[in-house]
Amino acid sequence: MRLTLVAIGVLSMVLVGLTGCASKGPVQTETFEQPVVEETAEAIIEPCTNLEMSLARAEELTHDTYYGATQYDGAVQFAFDSYKLSAEAKKAIDAVVLPLVEADKNFFLELQGHTDAFGEEAYNFQLGLNRARAVMGYIYQEYGLPLQRMNGFSCGELKPVAVNDLAQGRAENRRVTLVVIE
């Protein structure tokens, strides 16, 4: 569990670092103290469950003010052991993103990659991250949404929406949750 928490933190920092921009002038930095996080199951899965945390992350990453978050869970699904977007998954993404782009709203997208519980936890974590990145890449290529207006990370197998004992339940757990922050 501690390894998963550390991996989530490191990969989040890497994604934030990749979306930064270069500057010709001096860069201003802010100093802050990292809060101490208790190592409980709730603390580990909290990034994948709490819309208030999604809203706070978006404001921290963009320095903008947002007023609410809406979660779309279960529409963007994946085949077993895959992060390739199907035609159905692309349609589901389009249904969420196209109206936002057309309305020219200020919004931020959080993409949470999930897996079923089949396989090793570390492998599932990477697969969830690859799924979030696939959705992020599609949105960037299809709509030109700047990468700094998106954040993608993995929840791995930690937040199932269905029972993993049955094939149908495992299929429902292979997904990316889209959180729209406006």
Language-model segments: residues:
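Bacterial N-terminal signal peptides that target proteins for export
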Residues: 1-8
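A short, structure-level motif marking secondary-structure boundaries and short turns
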Residues: 3, 82, 120-122
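C-terminal motif of bacterial Sec signal peptides marking the signal peptidase cleavage site
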Residues: 17-20
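Periplasmic OmpA-like peptidoglycan-binding domain that tethers envelope proteins to the cell wall
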Residues: 114-182
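Periplasmic peptidoglycan-binding/tethering modules of Gram-negative envelope proteins
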Residues: 22-108
